[in-house]
Amino acid sequence: MQNTKLIIVFTLLALALTACGGAPVALPSTYPDAAVQVEVIALNHAPIRSAVEEVEALAAEYGEKVGYTRYDFDTDVGVAFAEKYGIDGHTPIAIYINGEDEFEIDGVATKFYSFPQDGGTGIVASGTWTMDDLRTVLDQ
């Protein structure tokens, strides 16, 4: 019985580390001298990780034209970044392009905050942006 409890505890611990783990998120800019800088701050766990990876891949398509920096809310650097922009609470992801997170796209104010459209969870709602919106801003 005691061994069974230990196995259960270690299994739950391993699952928790897998869900919240991954690479530490506080990466330096890919191209710090690029005219366009994309800064992403996100929670480093499963529900949002795929959106962060999509943003990272999109920024990489622009090569040296776009710098990309990623911050983790759970690091000192991430906390400082969040404080700089007044982000608090349970924010899955916020994206800043040259220090701005809201842009007008086709006459509509679009804020790169929270999950992309249709990407939310039962706990956190989707945002109002799409990857196509992000591409539109980066193309300008």
What feature does the model see in each segment?
Residues E64-G78:
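Thiol-based oxidoreductase modules, predominantly thioredoxin-like and allied folds used
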Residues L27-Y62:
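Local sequence-structure signature of Cys/Sec-based thiol-disulfide redox active-site neighborhoods
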